[in-house]
Amino acid sequence: MSLHFLYYCSEPTLDVKIAFCQGFDKHVDVSSIAKHYNMSKSKVDNQFYSVEVGDSTFTVLKRYQNLKPIGSGAQGIVCAAYDAVLDRNVAIKKLSRPFQNQTHAKRAYRELVLMKCVNHKNIISLLNVFTPQKTLEEFQDVYLVMELMDANLCQVIQMELDHERMSYLLYQMLCGIKHLHSAGIIHRDLKPSNIVVKSDCTLKILDFGLARTAGTSFMMTPYVVTRYYRAPEVILGMGYKENVDIWSVGCIMGEMVRHKILFPGRSYIDQWNKVIEQLGTPCPEFMKKLQPTVRNYVENRPKYAGLTFPKLFPDSLFPADSEHNKLKASQARDLLSKMLVIDPVKRISVDDALQHPYINVWYDPAEVEAPPPQIYDKQLDEREHTIEEWKELIYKEVMNSEEKTKNGVVKSQPSPSGAAVNSSESLPPSSAVNDISSMSTDQTLASDTDSSLEASAGPLGCCR
């Protein structure tokens, strides 16, 4: 099964349909009708309206206007909208069939809980969550309202970035990852399509549906992220720690430099071959850590010496050196050489990457050392429930949010300037976009493949 994402570079025409449901029994007398109407009038009549968006119907609060579809994926459909209460543009994600099965329900619960807990400038902010249904029995739709960004990293990768922008984007990626790691959350699904940016070079990480607390190592599955960005320990089924995210950042950085995917494997085997052809066959010490069957296969592959990093990433691929003495090709290449290390034990940590000369020019303790998120459900990833039990848990979360956010704001954050989608320019398609549209679902966690928000592109402006 493939995922197909929709791109809208110009304003689409929508067939907008306003639907108010009444549903009375024609045999009931007038007094009964009046009583029924007064007592059972749906929330939809008072607060909501419905809009046809492609093959889906969005039933949203009236405060959200001018809905425009901007993306779709395995986990839902995303629309841009104007929030009349906050006077800003937002993204509204309708979760796709969240109660289809236990895996969908668990993922929906996990995403909702994590988004409510995490509060960092480099992680997408949850502004609101709601459902148009008024009872648990009717409950079937979940809408997440988030910040609206200008583009995803797929589009930015095709741009000629100078060292300042490249370094600043990487710094923000690492800040967001460190914040997640501080709560024991390993993202595991980092890729260009779930990292979004604004025209002022602000970067945010999306999606926590695949995030899993670090303590569940004994149940780790190798089928977690888009293949091109999978770390060797994931490909080889070794288990993983925080360094799995550093490998993904290295792959993204390398793609920024080369403007093409570093390791475009067609399968796990091909992916491993692509890695060792460029980086070399790992040492026997690493091989000893592998399971016997995997080790037997890996040791019987052709041996590769690998290429040096100056050959993998020659100066000609980098932008001209910055006036800043640390933002140079040599420093960028050194960082790549520390991130793209097959053995996770020898791979650079997030903390050390943030101290690297190519990155620490932006170092701000308030961003790097932000208080860790408090995950109130400590058994988030160990929970196992029936679909109905998951449904009740999610319903309680939504009702709790609605109660706390009568004015529609879950996290009290200032409205960023320039939040509108900039769709006046169209960027070349990214190689990573091709990855998304043709991505096969290996034995993922039952549709735990991708739910990225695909935003319209806008040019990157100046860094701070």
Curated annotation (Swiss-Prot):
Expressing tissues: Brain (at protein level). Expressed specifically in neurons of the hippocampus, cortex, cerebellum, brainstem, and spinal cord. Seems to be also found in testis, and very weakly in the heart.
Start and end residues of each stretch annotated as Disordered: 405-464
Required cofactor(s): Mg(2+)
Entry-linked InterPro entries: Kinase-like_dom_sf (IPR011009), MAP_kinase (IPR050117), MAP_kinase_CS (IPR003527), MAPK_JNK (IPR008351), Prot_kinase_dom (IPR000719), Ser/Thr_kinase_AS (IPR008271)
Cellular component GO terms, alphabetical: cytoplasm; mitochondrion; nucleus; plasma membrane; postsynaptic density
Keyword Methyltransferase: no
Protein name: Mitogen-activated protein kinase 10
Protein species of origin: Mus musculus (Mouse)
